[in-house]
Amino acid sequence: MSEEVGIILREAVPGDAKDILLMMGQVNKETEFLVLDEAELLLPPETLEEELDYIYESNNNLLLLAIYEGTIIGTASVKADSQFRLSHVGEVGISILQEYWGMGLGTLMLEEIISWAKEMGVLFRLELDVQVRNERAVHLYRKMGFQIRSEERR
């Protein structure tokens, strides 16, 4: 897909902070599946820049950007716990602007995350939380080999 429509996948750097915040604000308006609180959406760019620097220098955290025509259209993240006993487990998250749903971008980004995790060799399990009613995401994760470990009810 990336070659067909000119999408670039690359790791986020501190200079991307403002554009990431804009993209996440847009995604938050487009879907009720994104679980962000007000503080995360109003995060000062300088604070996110510091976090992005930490992620970029880390070997068990990743923020991958999907960029089309200079605009961030999706993010895929892996966040590992800082506690040593849990630092081998990566929590996966994917957000895509609604205009780009159904084009295979989620698959492309998840493949890249899985490849990165194998290459780094420090994460031995990738896991995620997804709402059952988010059928697109559930389908993607099952297609990519993720298994349901538990279901929580409201």
For the regions a protein language model found, what residue spans apply to each?
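Acetyl-CoA-dependent GNAT
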Residues: P14-G15, G25-N28, E40-E99, L110-E112, ...
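A short beta-loop-alpha structural element at the N-terminal edge
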Residues: I8-L22
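A short glycine-leucine-enriched loop at secondary-structure breakpoints
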Residues: M103-L108
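A short, aromatic/hydrophobic, helix- or strand-capping loop or linear motif
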Residues: E32-A39
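Conserved active-site tyrosine of GNAT-family acetyltransferases
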Residues: Y141, F146
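Conserved small/polar residues in nucleotide/adenosyl-binding loops
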Residues: E152-R153
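Conserved GNAT acetyl-CoA-binding A-motif
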Residues: L110, A117-D129
